[in-house]
Amino acid sequence: MQGENFTIWSIFFLEGFSQYPGLEVVLFVFSLVMYLTTLLGNSTLILITILDSRLKTPMYLFLGNLSFMDICYTSASVPTLLVNLLSSQKTIIFSGCAVQMYLSLAMGSTECVLLAVMAYDRYVAICNPLRYSIIMNRCVCARMATVSWVTGCLTALLETSFALQIPLCGNLIDHFTCEILAVLKLACTSSLLMNTIMLVVSILLLPIPMLLVCISYIFILSTILRITSAEGRNKAFSTCGAHLTVVILYYGAALSMYLKPSSSNAQKIDKIISLLYGVLTPMLNPIIYSLRNKEVKDAMKKLLGKITLHQTHEHL
């Protein structure tokens, strides 16, 4: 459909990794394994936080939310990536592109806020253990989780709605998904309003939550160093270390994508970072938490034991 000096595209072509046809099969296998592992790992974490009564605490409520976000985030883009890696026609319709863009932004933005909330939860648990159950009661935790979701979903809606109104002078997206920065590179003219919205949202969801995380961990570290019991110190380091590892991986990748000078030569690097950010990080989250957390490992063993026992009874 023709407009004034621009076209409203009904279909987009995703360039993806078509410049490297020899790597597409390798990337397909890599992405498929990562995606299936993400689904299995995060679904297991959600399941054990629901079924195990010992995990009915704020930390595991937030961890369950994080796992659900990771499933939604990867499911928004990876299935399309897998199909396109094996297809000669790497296309996506406008509505599919819009949904993909929104879900990726919404889940990513929500996770940025939730990681800061989880840092505050660890701060209260370690620095104010006697008042923890009062400060982090069910109502407060539910509100914190809700604020994370609402903030992420509303900022994503704002960015997506404005991005989709910008006239585009092409329909070849130099990416494997409808990533907002890649789509905006097709804009016929630079939009000051869109650039301002992107900058404000990026600052709101990246440096500010990171600052809150850093402040929380400064207090946490000072408290841990004053713990005289070696067992208590190791337990505190274990739970905080898992969260801090996830924070560094997630915010590091996000900052390298959204708060750096734009460059036409950096698109190849952006695609690699985006692949790691969108596929590898969600897969690693449950592994990091389960490997470094005795309660999670015990709950997983208990769940596997029940499944094994059930299968044994069925065979008898």
Swiss-Prot record:
Query: What residues are glycosylation sites in this protein?
Result: 5
Question: What are the record's GO terms for cellular component?
Answer: plasma membrane
Subcellular locations according to the entry? Cell membrane
- Which spans are transmembrane here? 21-41, 66-86, 98-118, 144-164, 200-220, 239-259, 271-291
Q: Which PANTHER family match?
A: OLFACTORY RECEPTOR
List the stretches on the Extracellular face of the membrane.
1-20, 87-97, 165-199, 260-270
- Please give the function described in this protein's UniProt entry: Odorant receptor.
What family does this belong to?
A: Belongs to the G-protein coupled receptor 1 family.
The record, for CDD domains, names: 7tmA_OR13-like (cd15430)
The molecule here is called Olfactory receptor 2K2
- Give the record's membrane topology: Multi-pass membrane protein
Q: Which pairs are disulfide-linked?
A: 97-188
Keyword terms of this UniProt record: Cell membrane, Disulfide bond, G-protein coupled receptor, Glycoprotein, Membrane, Olfaction, Receptor, Sensory transduction, Transducer, Transmembrane, Transmembrane helix
Q: Which residues lie on this side of the membrane: Cytoplasmic?
A: 42-65, 119-143, 221-238, 292-316
A Gene Ontology molecular function term of the record: olfactory receptor activity
| UniProt keyword annotation of Cell wall biogenesis/degradation present | no
Q: Name one GO biological process term.
A: detection of chemical stimulus involved in sensory perception of smell
